[in-house]
Amino acid sequence: RRGDVMLLINGMPVIHIELKRSKVDVSQATFQIKRYTHEGVFGNGIFKMVQIFVAMTPEETLYFANPGKEENFKPEFYFHWEDFNNTVIRDWRRIVSDLLSIPMAHQLIGYYTIADDKDKTLKVLRSYQYFAASKISDITHKTNWDTHQHRGGYVWHTTGSGKTMTSFKSAQLIANSGDADKVVFLLDRIELSVQSLDEYRGFAGEDEAIQDTQNTAILLSKLKSTDNDDRLIVT
């Protein structure tokens, strides 16, 4: 079998695009990708490096992270790409220019995917998560912190919208950019703190440490520490 379009970054196949003609339901493209997985196309050799799947018709596009196994294909993790105001982009030309362009395609792969160690799956951010994390990181970078006139901000989330992943990715971007010495996840309930700590550690890379604080003394020591492993703190 032969796929339709493969995007390469530095010679490596990372985004597979499956196309269907106009008026054909986009689900046929996702089914085709799932069939390729069943046949082992993405399980061996160089195509095992594919990170993102894109199912596209001229009128509709879905994108999702490579789930690895056929049984892990779940439609609830197929996402439409939306603009900053959460309006679904349907025209394929906008998808190409907004999502599959350079440098956006590079950023999606490099910064806005998460290899979740808990369930051993790759996750990609929804568009609104991308815009939130990107905006927070950008404002943090551009702010003059010497003025002492900076204001706080918030991201409005509903239940099940992925706030844990959004907060982690925002913190990760800020910490890795060097724009902050410390990033603190402040939770208002012990149960939520334990749950979030577990999820954050699943999201973190091999070279990233998420620090827990059992009491005020430990929190103070982590805040004073200059160790890179103490940059991300949950309390």
Regions of interest found by a model, annotated:
Residues 26-30, 213-217, 234:
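Amphipathic alpha-helical transducer elements in NTP-driven molecular machines
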Residues 206-214:
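Conserved AMP-binding/adenylation subdomain of ANL enzymes
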